[in-house]
Amino acid sequence: MATTTSLLSSCLCALLLAPLFSQGVDAWESRQGASRQCRFDRLQAFEPLRKVRSEAGDTEYFDERNEQFRCAGVFVIRRVIEPQGLVVPRYSNTPALAYIIQGKGYVGLTFPGCPATHQQQFQLFEQRQSDQAHKFRDEHQKIHEFRQGDVVALPASVAHWFYNGGDTPAVVVYVYDIKSFANQLEPRQKEFLLAGNNQRGQQIFEHSIFQHSGQNIFSGFNTEVLSEALGINTEASKRLQSQNDQRGDIIRVKHGLQLLKPTLTQRQEEHRQYQQVQYREGQYNGLDENFCTIKARVNIENPSRADYYNPRAGRITLLNNQKFPILNLIGMGAARVNLYQNALLSPFWNINAHSVVYIIQGSVRVQVANNQGRSVFNGVLHQGQLLIIPQNHAVIKKAEHNGCQYVAIKTISDPTVSWVAGKNSILRALPVDVIANAYRISRDEARRLKNNRADEIGPFTPRFPQKSQRGYQFLTEGLSLIGM
């Protein structure tokens, strides 16, 4: 029996890990093809369109019916989780990246086939007036602590939950990839609740293109059969089905969750013990170890992790499958950008992905140009707004007087951008004569254009004082910064 269980566990891990370690599928073909009718002629800034209230928080939905979301193949929500709020366990048909805008707490992911190696012991009193206590031991899979600036990877069909263990609301933005090959259903985000319900959300989104949660999955089973399968009575089965439960899908934990928070030494010891058990029981094959202990959370707000840094302009932190291997399973990447007052970002385009830009703080002026050289967006993005930037569209950004911080979620696990100006840019790579003839300028002008900003990459220092907020021409300045 032990051998059968071990074999089943290994098979499950192998199936789920196949995309994680396989190099046979080209990264450029990691998503289902977009409709040829998609057009990005006029981009717009988005804010949440609808809100669904639960007992301990809100779920805010962006306009998933808009063509830009459907063409980019993304579905975006924002959750506000109140202190002691628990986002009940669930899974989705599509993978997602969750970015922690603010707050702290815990998140759990339950990978199939992985053992429950984390143990904690509780002591409960039956009644307050009683001195009798009962001890019991709980075993579960790893729990991750999250904090502001974290990216949490949520693989498709893997159950997960969030809990706000802090004193202030936690704000989380989720971006789902509905065109992922992990989704074998229709190209829509579908959430399968393991507990609670979302009746109010079902009513609000009755005519929505996306299928939002109603009752949890246990509601679809016969009570007697469910009781027999789980070894519980019918009353308990009805509770699993959340009948007459009006709390929604973000519930309040009255006395807080009692969770184990191991120190680094304890984590290392648990890791060592897990390896010993796997070898001793003959189960170790490399897959279980890598998959069951894979890192699902990483912080990209920490300045020390910046990939590009300009002390006078800002910093950029990139997140790809080399830094965060679970992204191979997700098929998405990210970047966090912090621009100082009036700083610019070198003109660029995304080579292999669409980009979902969410403004965390401050404001930024953005211009986007399409393949015909036409402006498809020219405006200022403010805190809480979102902009979808299509693949290959040229972009230029300039922070306002209050600076800007934003996160960009990319629709591929190894996103790449092509800078127009600065170090390692297109202009730096072109011969002077090519530049001179292409733009009908002298060789000296071409040389200056090529070498301008040669010591900068990504964030650019502002060089032109602003006399008034209304007075400057943004595009003219953008071209001036690269010497044109």
UniProtKB/Swiss-Prot annotation:
SMART domains assigned: Cupin_1
Locations listed in the record: Protein storage vacuole
Signal peptide: 1-27
An individual GO BP term: seed development
Cupin type-1 domain boundaries: 43-238, 298-447
Gene Ontology terms for molecular function: nutrient reservoir activity
Keywords in alphabetical order: Disulfide bond, Seed storage protein, Signal, Storage protein, Vacuole
Disulphides: 38-71, 114-292
GO cellular component, one term: protein storage vacuole
Family: Belongs to the 11S seed storage protein (globulins) family.
Subunit structure of this chain's protein: Hexamer; each subunit is composed of an acidic and a basic chain derived from a single precursor and linked by a disulfide bond.
Primary role: Seed storage protein.
Record-given protein name: Glutelin type-D 1
